[in-house]
């Protein structure tokens, strides 16, 4: 059974459900910005978010996903203890782990790991309560908890295909001093993992729950490593959009894509880097749209790509589809493929891994694709890559007989 790593928690961050009848896939795949659990009189002076795609060590091997590091500078008008946290729905892993076949993995945590938090340089721990369980009096009195129970509609929630019975509250107590307070936290999470793509969604419109409803000085960094990624355009409440800056080397460009349920095409950033990261900095950040990032794992299986980017880069072509379906090609289809085409088809797995071709024709051909960023001769292929090469080589050998 396929393991589902559900990106729910984004440690010390928050997803408040104001509409439990919302699209369940989107709902359960989002984390978000930490918020005050009671009405806040605190201002966010600065915030820096760093998303880094990487694998980390886990009990069962290496866990793919993204490491998140966030640094806040808050301005508090007075000293005192504050409750800060988030509410998130039950993970789909609970139902998955109820299957006897999967109980041996019941102690695994697929939501997040390597969690660290500090307030003004001192480490703090996170408290967790399931909202179907008994809640301490001080927790039940928090405004966000009362709001959750007031808005929870069991009948509407039960109508969803994947019904979450209730949620969890995660929070920490911060002893703030008057004036500036620094909160730092980091963690690793797995996102929603699939054979075609991994999705990492992040709710940050909840910035509006803080007193100033914005971040005075904001910066976000996305470090994708060698992943091919897409990030839908993000608009801010002032009408401006997030314009990503490439710090490093690689290919980035925009295309237009229609997502499921949308009537119009969205402007989407595509990026494949050799080194470096994407960055956005601004003053008075107040987002209208949420952050969404998709790691594209299988180009030949992706359901939709724009034909070209704004700069003219391509994403895929007929020869790629032929290469990954070589064993299914019919005789009349094979006749249309030249020997030169077969050589290109055979080298697609190498190109996708960033192989730096010495053959100028091959290098020129693959350079038209945004995802082709040569990194060297030593690239790692997997079993399915060798299967593609093997299938094409069979066709080449048959022509020599």
Region annotations inferred by a language model:
Residues 244, 315-318, 358:
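Long, non-globular segments of proteins
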Residues 9-17:
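Bacterial N-terminal signal peptides
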Residues 321-337:
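A short, flexible low-complexity segment enriched in Lys/Arg and Gly/Pro that occurs
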Residues 311-325:
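Short, charge-rich amphipathic alpha-helices with coiled-coil/heptad character
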Residues 357, 365-401:
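Compact alpha-helical subdomains of small soluble proteins
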Residues 333-372:
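Amphipathic alpha-helical packing elements
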Residues 22-312:
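Lumenal/extracellular ectodomains and adaptor appendage modules
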Residues 1-8:
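Bacterial N-terminal signal peptides that target proteins for export
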């Amino acid at each position: 059974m396929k393991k589902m790593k559900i990106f729910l928690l984004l440690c010390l961050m928050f997803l408040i459900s104001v509409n439990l009848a919302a699209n369940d896939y989107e709902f359960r795949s989002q984390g978000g910005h930490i918020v005050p659990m009671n009405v806040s009189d605190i201002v966010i002076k600065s915030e820096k978010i760093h998303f880094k795609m990487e694998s980390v060590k886990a009990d069962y091997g290496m866990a793919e996903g993204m490491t998140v590091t966030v640094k806040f500078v808050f301005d508090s008008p007075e000293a005192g203890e504050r409750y800060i946290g988030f509410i998130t729905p039950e993970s789909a892993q609970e139902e998955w782990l109820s299957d006897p076949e999967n109980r041996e993995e019941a102690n695994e945590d697929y939501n997040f790991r390597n969690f660290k938090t500090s307030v003004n340089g001192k480490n703090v721990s996170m408290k967790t309560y399931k909202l179907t369980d008994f809640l301490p009096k001080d927790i039940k009195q928090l405004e966000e908890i009362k709001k959750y129970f007031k808005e929870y509609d069991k009948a509407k929630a039960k109508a969803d295909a994947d019904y979450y019975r209730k949620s969890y509250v995660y929070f920490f107590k911060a002893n703030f001093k008057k004036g500036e307070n620094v909160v730092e936290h980091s963690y690793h999470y797995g996102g929603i993992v699939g054979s075609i793509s991994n999705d990492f969604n992040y709710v940050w419109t909840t910035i509006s729950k803080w007193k100033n409803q914005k971040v005075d000085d904001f910066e976000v960094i996305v470090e994708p490593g060698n992943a091919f990624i897409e990030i839908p355009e993000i608009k801010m409440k002032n009408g401006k959009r997030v314009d990503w800056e490439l710090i490093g080397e690689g290919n980035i460009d925009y295309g237009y894509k229609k997502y499921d349920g949308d009537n119009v095409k969205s402007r989407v950033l595509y990026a494949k880097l050799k080194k470096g990261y994407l960055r956005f900095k601004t003053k008075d950040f107040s987002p209208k749209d949420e952050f969404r990032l998709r790691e594209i794992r299988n180009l030949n299986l992706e359901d939709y790509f724009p034909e070209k980017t704004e700069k003219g880069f391509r994403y895929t072509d007929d020869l790629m589809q032929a290469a990954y379906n070589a064993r299914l090609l019919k005789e009349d289809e094979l006749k249309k493929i030249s020997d030169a085409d077969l050589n290109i088809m055979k080298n697609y797995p190498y190109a996708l891994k960033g192989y730096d071709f010495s053959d100028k024709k091959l290098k020129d051909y693959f350079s038209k694709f945004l995802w082709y960023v040569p990194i060297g001769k030593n690239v790692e292929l997997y079993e399915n890559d060798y299967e593609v090469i093997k299938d094409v080589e069979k066709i080449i050998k048959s022509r020599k007989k």
